[in-house]
Amino acid sequence: MTMTDPIADFLTRLRNANSAYHDEVTLPHSKIKANIAEILKKEGYISDYRTEDARVGKSLVVQLKYGPSRERSIAGLRRVSKPGLRVYAKSTNLPRVLGGLGVAIISTSSGLRTDRQAAREGVGGEVLAYVW
């Protein structure tokens, strides 16, 4: 069965593993998912991620991050632009998540960027997700 929205599946698996206090989550690999995982790592939402070769294909293993008393570092994830309704933002009108405390992941012509990186570079694009 083909997947309609692999990014939403990625975010849902992260959300479910995070709410169940799993240490890591394994999911199908793709370049865009690896790029999103890289952004989440740089922003401090996950500890690490790695690519593993499985029997069928590659898989992406994301290690979730928790605080000293097991508080979650990811409070919420939300898919913004969906296959049925794409959401775009100009460089002058980029979204801010929780007044700058969260991160908007934006697909630009120069790759995936956070809202702050896109504003600094002066580029807009498709708003993929919010993370806080």
From Swiss-Prot:
Presence of the UniProt keyword RNA-binding in the record: yes
Q: Name one GO molecular function term.
A: rRNA binding
| Gene Ontology annotations for the cellular component aspect, listed alphabetically | ribonucleoprotein complex; ribosome
Query: What are its GO biological-process terms?
Result: translation
Keywords attached to this Swiss-Prot or TrEMBL record, sorted alphabetically, are: Ribonucleoprotein, Ribosomal protein, RNA-binding, rRNA-binding
Q: Does the keyword Ribosomal protein apply?
A: yes
One Pfam match, by short name?
Answer: Ribosomal_S8
Please state which protein family the record places this protein in. Answer: Belongs to the universal ribosomal protein uS8 family.
Question: What is the annotated quaternary arrangement, including any partners?
Answer: Part of the 30S ribosomal subunit. Contacts proteins S5 and S12.
The name this protein carries in UniProt is Small ribosomal subunit protein uS8
**Organismal lineage:** Bacteria, Bacillati, Actinomycetota, Actinomycetes, Mycobacteriales
